[in-house]
Regions:
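A short, glycine/small-residue-rich beta-strand->loop->alpha-helix junction that serves as a flexible
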Residues: 7-19
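Conserved nucleotide-sugar phosphate-binding/catalytic loop shared by glycosyltransferases and other
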Residues: 9, 27-85
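Short, polar loop motifs at secondary-structure junctions
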Residues: 37-43, 113-116, 174-179, 236-245
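Conserved nucleotide-sugar donor-binding subdomain of glycosyltransferases
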Residues: 72-108, 115-116
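A donor-sugar binding/catalytic signature common to diverse glycosyltransferases
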Residues: 109-112, 264-304
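Active-site-proximal region of nucleotide-activated glycan assembly enzymes
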Residues: 128-189
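Leloir-type glycosyltransferase catalytic cores
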Residues: 163-168, 314-332
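Donor-nucleotide binding loops and adjacent catalytic segments primarily
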Residues: 191-268
Length: 332
């Protein structure tokens, strides 16, 4: 079977899932003939993906999300304005996607939550069937729990999710745990897509806490938590750290962002502190490491992940770096 990928390039989650499925399909004897990755003028295809993906990678413009530069909070209004301003190049992108599909004639297009896919199939109707994969399709499941209130964010999330999957033959909803399918919504619930690099790790019972610190305010909160609990060993992977290891004191060390090293540390830690991105929480759960999930401000999707993760028993959630809450959650 010849497969063409279409991937949202925002963040690491969907790209990482695509790498995982690429590995699985190759091992099963199928041919992944290429990947179309949605990018913006400010964001190209990440090197970690292009270096690991063995088939041709084609970047195509797609409107991106807008985040507050200081707080990293999602800005829905600015995101909408940006999408309106880029309507003309977006239409060109849809025609590019349609032409690539019709020229390469794969047996199936697999769409990892990229709006280019849903809109191309809605407006230009390629002849090749499309299957969509993402945790976000759990939003169409009757058992999926959302934050109370926040009507605007809930509707925006569902509309955005629907725009990615117009014309799809089936929606594969990645889930923390086993759930029944939703045939009326074309939703089939499937396990998370984990990279071979994760499944090959051999976890041990560690004593240190591991934190992935990308939000600007999270490092400040980590330092405050460290002052309150100086006896707890913590390792923090921080986007502002340039050295592999930057020791603060005997129980706190910061590390430069390094995906391979982070996984190695995860396999040896006691628990992790991270944003509520689906992929990292799933990797921690697979390795038996409870998570303190801290959703990004105004990021409705991550707020949903945090609620769903707590329901599935993979960790606990907080709006801040609440070390006491994580300690109380850990088995005694």
């Amino acid at each position: 079977m010849r497969v063409l990928f279409l991937i949202q390039g925002e963040g690491r989650g969907h790209l990482t899932q695509a790498l995982s499925l690429h590995q699985m399909l190759k091992q099963a004897g199928h041919d992944v003939i290429g990947a179309i990755v949605g990018v913006t003028a400010e964001r190209d295809v990440p090197a970690f993906f292009s270096s690991a993906f063995t088939a041709p990678v084609t970047p195509i413009f797609s409107p991106g999300l807008v985040y507050n530069a200081k707080t990293n909070a999602l800005e829905p209004f600015k995101t909408t304005l940006k999408a309106i301003r880029t309507m003309r190049p977006f239409w060109r992108s849809l025609k590019q996607v349609r032409n690539m599909i019709e020229t390469q004639q794969p047996d199936v297009v697999v769409n990892f939550y990229e709006m280019l896919g849903g809109m191309t199939y809605a407006l230009l109707r390629p002849s090749v069937p499309m299957v969509c994969i993402a945790h976000q399709y759990m939003a169409f499941h009757t058992n999926f729990q959302c934050p109370k209130g926040q009507w605007f964010y809930r509707q925006a999330f569902k509309i955005n999710t629907r725009l990615t999957c117009f014309g799809a033959n089936e929606l594969l909803a990645l889930s923390f745990d086993k759930q029944p399918d939703e045939p009326s919504q074309r939703v089939r619930v499937v396990p998370p897509l984990l990279r071979q690099e994760v499944t090959e790790l051999k976890p041990i019972e560690g004593h240190s806490l591991l934190a992935y610190v990308t939000q600007p305010g999270l490092k400040v909160e980590l330092l405050k938590a460290h002052e309150q609990h100086p006896g707890i060993h913590m390792d923090g992977f921080h986007s502002g750290t340039t050295l592999p290891d930057q020791k603060v004191d005997d129980t706190l060390t910061f590390h430069a962002i390094d995906g391979k090293r982070f996984l190695e540390f995860m396999a040896q830690c006691k628990a992790i502190v991270t944003t509520a991105g689906f992929e990292s929480v799933c990797e921690a759960a697979y390795l038996g490491k409870p998570a303190l999930m801290i959703p990004q401000a105004n990021h409705y999707e991550q707020a949903c992940n945090a609620i769903d993760g707590q329901r599935a028993g993979v960790g606990t959630a907080s709006s801040r770096f609440d070390l006491d809450k994580l300690i109380d959650y850990l088995p005694k």
